[in-house]
Amino acid sequence: MRTPRLRALALAAALLFGLTACGGQDGDQGKQDDSGAAGADGSGRFPVTVKHALGTTVVPSEPKRVATVNWANEEVPLALGVVPVGMAKANFGDDDGDGVLPWTEKRLKELDAKTPVLFDETDGIDFEAVADTKPDVILAAYSGLTEQDYETLSQIAPVVAYPEAAWATPWRDIIRQNSKAIGLAEEGDKLIGDLEGRISKTAAKYPQLKGKTAMFMTHVSSKDVSQVGFYTTHDTRTQFFTDLGMKIPASVSGPSESTKKFVLTKSAERIDDFNDVDIITGYGDDTGELLGALKDDPLTSKLAAVKRGSIYLLPGSTPLATAANPTPLSIPYVLDDYAKALAEAADKVK
C-alpha cells in the first residue's frame, strides 16, 4: 500500500512528466556544459553533468550520500571507496540469502563498512525506501528505469540512468556513468584499465577461447525446448565474449542488426541456423535437467554444439551464475572460473 508521501512523490513526478511532454523539452535537469565546472565546494569536480537516455542530470556538488537502484550499480562507488547509503537487494546468485553478493560483502569488509540499506525490488523500485536514505544522488547506469521511474526518483535526488538502452549498458560504461556522477571520473577510468588488464591476462591463460564463436542461450526450459532464446549483441553477456577473445556468430549478430531487443527467440525447427556456434553457454539448474533435455530432444540434439558437448550452463543458485554479466567487483571474483569453464567447452571443438 502506498503511503501519502509516496503518493505525493508519484503525483509530483506525473505532473512534471506531463509538463515536460507538453512543453517539448528534453527532460534536462540543468544547462551546464557537459564537461562540468569548478564547484563552490572547491574540488574543481562539480557541478557534474551526465547525459543519459532519459535526459541530462546535473549533480551540483559532491554527493555525501549515494544510493543505487537495480543491478550492480553499487559496485562502482564501492570499488572507488565510496559506501552507498542504500542499494538494491541481490535477487540472483545470492548463495546465502542475505541479499548481498559475496564480492560486495568482501569489499564492504575491506572498507570496514556496514551493509547499506537494502532495497527490495521484487515488485519494482521501492521509492519510499530510497527516499528514506536521503541520497544526494541515485546511480542507475545499469538499470531498466522507465521514464516514470526516472521522474519519480528525480523528486528524491538527481538520477543517472543508462546511456542508451535499458539493461544494455556495457560494464565499462557502467563505470564511466556512475563514477562521473560522484566526481570520480579519472578514478573510474583507472578502474576500467585495471579490469581490462585482468581480463587480458585471463584470456591469455586460456588461448583455446581465441576465435571461437559463442552464443548465450536464455529463456529455455527443460520442460520445453521447442523455442531457443538467445541474447543479442545488445546484451552485456554477449558483448563479454569478445573481451575474452571470442567471436559472435552470424546466427546471433545477423538478427541483432535489425532489432534493439536484447533477447530473441527462434523455433527449434530452425536449430540448424546455430551450427555456426562453437560454444553455447546459458543459465542452467543444479540437476542438469536442461542439458539432458537438449540432448534428448529430436531437434535440439541435432545442434553441433550439443552433439560434441561444447556447452556450459551456469549453475543458477550460485554466485558464478552472475559471471557472464560482468560488473566491477564480480570480474576479479568469478572471471577465472567462468573463463576456465568456457575453455573446457572450447576444448571439445575440433
Question: What positions do the PLM features span?
Answer:
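Bacterial N-terminal signal peptides that target proteins for export
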Residues: 1-10
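Bacterial signal peptide processing site
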Residues: 23-26
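Extracytoplasmic low-complexity, Pro/Thr/Ser/Ala/Gly-rich segments
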Residues: 30-83, 90-96, 339-350
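Extracytoplasmic substrate-binding proteins
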Residues: 56, 148, 155-224, 324-350
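A short, structured surface patch at a secondary-structure boundary
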Residues: 74-126
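Alpha-helical, coiled-coil/dimerization segments enriched in small aliphatic residues
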Residues: 228-262
